[in-house]
């Protein structure tokens, strides 16, 4: 396009910020030391887990990082909440990776279960991290994409996962709210997802599954709600056990498997043979969505700042009591 009105005004607007006169190498060194410490902490959190990327690949699976990289356009990943760990979990995270990325040129918000850490189990603080992601998608009106591989709730810490206003149930309410607002929630589902990992069928717009994916509820409290009596007693438990024995004789599909959710319930919109197939399915549905065109509100072609960004290491002081000119920051 590059044909904008009032070029004499917008292309000759006054600049802000002054050239750096006195570099501060000591301040630069202190800031870069903090940056390096943050980068190292993020690396340790990403590397932590009970399995490795190599072992996952040997089993025919991709890691969360590999799935994200396969989904997004190269160089567009903007990770967020990388060190968020409000409950001090042992792997230094909440077992999910999330952030912004472009898929075929369109920005989306991505949440990926970290399958190196307890197969992506729900741990304390994860629900709040999911809400941070969903709230950002809501605010920016971006599609929310899950790469789900969740082994359910970490049992010893159930009391820290489910309760609370921003606890285990709220992300599902938020997903439903996004649907009502016209913000799609698209889920690619891998592996076995019992209990808390299986509830994502309740609220997403589209579910795309790996052929070996499984998604089912679990726990006596949940099963009791599915029983006509409203609770589980010895008789009901015996019925469940006997049904499992009988089903095993007739090769009835396991609860939550692809034959159930693709052929019967319709929760799975599409099923693919491998990890990358699921990614391609997600991309297909992203392509169906409209995209905001930056040209709509542009008044001039974007340009890099006139002043070098490297100057910020000298301008922004480590000593927070020292003043600085915010226009010098804006100018870079």
Residue ranges, per PLM feature:
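Conserved catalytic cores of soluble enzyme domains
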Residues: 2-3, 12, 18, 148-294
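Short acidic (Asp/Glu) and glycine-rich catalytic loops that position anionic groups and cofactors
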Residues: 48-51, 258-266, 303-313
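Short coil/turn segments at secondary-structure boundaries
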Residues: 49-57, 82-85, 294-301
């Amino acid at each position: 396009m590059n044909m904008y009105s009032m070029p004499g005004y917008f292309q000759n607007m006054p600049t802000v910020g002054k050239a750096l006169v006195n570099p501060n190498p000591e301040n630069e060194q202190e800031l870069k030391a903090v940056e390096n410490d943050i980068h190292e902490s993020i690396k340790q959190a990403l590397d932590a887990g009970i399995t490795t990327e190599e072992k996952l690949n040997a089993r025919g699976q991709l890691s969360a990082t590999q799935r994200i990289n396969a989904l997004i356009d190269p160089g567009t990943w903007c990770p967020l909440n990388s060190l968020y760990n409000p409950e001090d979990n042992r792997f230094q995270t909440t077992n999910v990776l999330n952030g912004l990325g472009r898929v075929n040129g369109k920005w989306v918000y991505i949440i990926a279960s970290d399958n190196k850490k307890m197969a992506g189990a729900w741990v304390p603080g994860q629900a709040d991290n999911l809400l941070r992601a969903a709230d950002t998608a809501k605010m920016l009106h971006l599609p929310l994409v899950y790469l789900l591989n969740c082994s359910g709730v970490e049992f010893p810490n159930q009391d820290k996962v489910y309760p609370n206003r921003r606890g285990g149930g709220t992300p599902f309410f938020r997903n439903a709210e996004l649907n009502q607002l016209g913000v799609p929630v698209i889920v690619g589902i891998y592996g076995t997802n019992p209990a808390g990992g299986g509830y994502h069928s309740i609220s997403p717009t589209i579910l795309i599954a790996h052929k070996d994916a499984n998604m089912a509820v679990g726990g006596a409290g949940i099963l009791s709600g599915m029983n006509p009596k409203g609770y589980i007693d010895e008789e009901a438990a015996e019925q469940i056990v006997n049904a499992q024995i009988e089903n095993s004789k007739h090769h009835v599909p396991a609860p939550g498997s692809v034959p159930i959710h693709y052929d019967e319930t319709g929760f799975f919109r599409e099923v693919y043979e491998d990890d990358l197939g699921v990614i391609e399915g997600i991309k297909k549905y992203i392509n169906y969505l409209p995209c905001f065109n930056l040209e709509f509100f542009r008044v001039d072609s974007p340009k890099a700042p006139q002043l070098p960004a490297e100057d910020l290491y000298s301008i922004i002081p480590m000593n927070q009591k020292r003043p600085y000119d915010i226009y010098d920051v804006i100018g870079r």
